[in-house]
Amino acid sequence: MQSAYDLVVIGGAIAGASTAFLLKRQHPSLRVLIIEKTEEFDRKVGESTSEVGACFLTRVLNLSNHLGHEQITKSGLRMWFYRDSHDSYTRCAEIGPKHQTRLPAFQLDRSKLDEAVLNKALRVGCELWRPAKVMDLELGGEGNNRVDVRVNEETRTVSARWVIDATGRNAVVPRKLKLFRPLETHPINAIWARFRKTTDLDGPEIWESAPGFAEPCWAMRQWATNHLMGYGWWGWLIQLKGGDCSVGLVYDQRLFELPPGPNLGERLKSHLMTHPMGKKALCDAECIEKDVHARSNLAYYSAQSMGDGWAVVGDAAGFLDPLYSQGFDFISYTCYATFEILSDRFAGKDISQSRARYNELYQKQFHTWFESIYQDKYYYLGDAELMTVAFYLDIGAYFIGPVGQAYSNHPHRYSELPYGGPIGQLFGKLMRCYNARLAAIAKRRIANGTYGLHNLDSRLFLPGFIPGPASFKFMLTGIRKWLELECKNQLQRRRSDALPGIGQATPLAPS
């Protein structure tokens, strides 16, 4: 059997289905085929959105009804720090919102979301083969692509004017074209699972046993994306619709090694329970069997995002780090930029310049994002004072730039990638600078035994961030705190130089 399609999308989850839906809706006459290998989607990792990704889901894909009925509204980002595993959870330093967040974000059962987006694509006329496996792929340029597909016991061959790779980390096209690149300077691994019977952080047990801990926070801690912070690692607790909780750990291989244990689920739980808040949340929790996953060397990218007759979207284009939940941001940018460029092409326009510009800007964005936010960040993740500075600056810059851009002129702002213009490049330079300095200060603190000294008895409750210039006040606060840190660091260095032997204590690095 052989058929001809204008567009073949390999991968039917959110990245592939979104791009197919947008193109088919814009050009109803296109023949669009989606090839999905699974009979039903699983609950994959990537369960928390940030504000940019949420804007894409609500204002571009118009999924507000699904998100309101089938998913959980996220109660912000919350971080917990500790010094010793015997500390009380009530003493853990905390960073998070004082009250409910002002812009929507969500905690997602990905299997439900992926199915909802795929159904939207089918309703506008896309064709679906499922379960189906791509057996061979020939990329011969626009109009000369061929895909061999196994559907049940039948082998089908299709020709495609364009092929979109939405296969996630499998990255079929980048690997085939030798464009797949591991990001070796960011060697992070992850383990995650779903648990039942986690402690309700807003429940009566907390209010009765620790009213002084519960009372000051007006927001719901339980529905936040809760982060357990440590030296070289961080863990997440994400509540899902129906009562299950996604629990995960991300760590830098250079700084942390997962302790041994009978199985991955027990190793994950055992380690996170060394954190007092993890111990409180997971003390009675039960790991759901056959729902434990691990992945090494998370960070990677494709050296090219679009070529002659092909494009990569979502995680197939690259992935940096789960911290700050920005995976959906990259899905949004790659899907919408690809949609706009291919929409022009299907309308008969020349896209050579826009394709070249997109390839250049994506690489610039990816590497700027890495160098500005994630490079060597795992050195200071476990120090509350350093992460307070980073929180003000990282989140402030995010709301001034990407969030403000998404909400100011949606949806076309998704094809204008952040950090591409002069202002974005200026912010990128500032962010690279403070990120590198915070990592350097952390290394000095580790060496002299002062790492994490402010990890107890501190609460930083922030008002909600809003897009655009209003978030400059958070940036200014962050810059002031950064400069204070630099002064403190210089004074400590001078004292150490003046009095040899001072600062040679055993390093304090929470494990």
Predicted regions and their residues:
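Beta1/beta-strand and adjacent pyrophosphate-binding region of the FAD-binding site
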Residues: 2-15, 33
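Glycine-rich FAD pyrophosphate-binding loop
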Residues: 24-45
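Short beta-strand to alpha-helix junction loop
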Residues: 98-119, 257-262
